[in-house]
Amino acid sequence: MKTAIIQLPGLNRDQDMLVALHHITGVEPIKIWQTESTIPDVDVIVIPGGFSYGDYLRCGAIGARTPVLQAVREKAQKGVTVIGICNGFQILLEARLLPGALMRNTSLKFVCREIKLEVVNANTRFSRYYSKGQIIRCPVAHHDGNYFVDNETLKQMEDNEQIVFRYAENTNPNGSIRDIAGIINKAGNILGMMPHPENFIEPAHSGTDGRLLFQSALELTNG
């Protein structure tokens, strides 16, 4: 299985993602720099977390307007699987590849801790190896993770089952509407989420709850 990791100035979780994907697939991901206007044939494209371009203007605003993001858009339109984690999620929202926006945490503080997620929709290419209602552990590390969307769009998302993960058991770290932690687009091939599943893929690193997300996306057997 071939994977690609998008690299932008200020993204600092690319190495974490590379280690995770390499560990799961046995194949080292391709790194795609910001100035690239094409992306080779791959099965999954990942935009990792960090602080692209120093979060100037808005988190993800500059990153969403780079040549490589246009290439990501073109691949996504062809049905290629795309995952945006944390700042990657912010970039996907700024690029209008996903609905809604991410605002400053209601605490006005950077939040870095382990939280619990509820699997809301287990019938997606990202969650098929989980069970609906399953509670999983995952870390968060962000300052602007407060997801917001207007009521009309929220209803459409709920009707379309686009909400994949929610913060569970009063663990919402940022004030996100309806405790939303991860969503997909209508076509179901783009996932954006604030938590970092790439950090929970080995038992020695606090657990393996994040591993199934990548195995699901890559259609790898659960094992």
Swiss-Prot record:
Biological process (GO), any one: 'de novo' IMP biosynthetic process
Recorded GO MF terms: ATP binding; glutaminase activity; phosphoribosylformylglycinamidine synthase activity
Gene encoding the protein: purQ
Function of the molecule: Part of the phosphoribosylformylglycinamidine synthase complex involved in the purines biosynthetic pathway. Catalyzes the ATP-dependent conversion of formylglycinamide ribonucleotide (FGAR) and glutamine to yield formylglycinamidine ribonucleotide (FGAM) and glutamate. The FGAM synthase complex is composed of three subunits. PurQ produces an ammonia molecule by converting glutamine to glutamate. PurL transfers the ammonia molecule to FGAR to form FGAM in an ATP-dependent manner.
Annotated PANTHER family: PHOSPHORIBOSYLFORMYLGLYCINAMIDINE SYNTHASE SUBUNIT PURQ
Record-annotated Glutamine amidotransferase type-1 domain positions: 2-223
Predominant localisation class: cytoplasm
Pathway as given in its UniProt record: Purine metabolism; IMP biosynthesis via de novo pathway; 5-amino-1-(5-phospho-D-ribosyl)imidazole from N(2)-formyl-N(1)-(5-phospho-D-ribosyl)glycinamide: step 1/2
Keywords: ATP-binding, Cytoplasm, Glutamine amidotransferase, Hydrolase, Ligase, Nucleotide-binding, Purine biosynthesis
Keyword Nucleotide-binding included in the entry's annotation: yes
Pfam families, sorted: GATase_5 (PF13507)
Name of this chain's protein: Phosphoribosylformylglycinamidine synthase subunit PurQ
InterPro entries on file: Class_I_gatase-like, PRibForGlyAmidine_synth_PurQ
Subcellular location: Cytoplasm
GO cellular component, one term: cytoplasm
Residues in the signal sequence: none
Subunit structure: Part of the FGAM synthase complex composed of 1 PurL, 1 PurQ and 2 PurS subunits.
EC number: 6.3.5.3, 3.5.1.2
Gene3D superfamilies given in the database record: 3.40.50.880
Swiss-Prot/TrEMBL catalytic activity: N(2)-formyl-N(1)-(5-phospho-beta-D-ribosyl)glycinamide + L-glutamine + ATP + H2O = 2-formamido-N(1)-(5-O-phospho-beta-D-ribosyl)acetamidine + L-glutamate + ADP + phosphate + H(+); L-glutamine + H2O = L-glutamate + NH4(+)
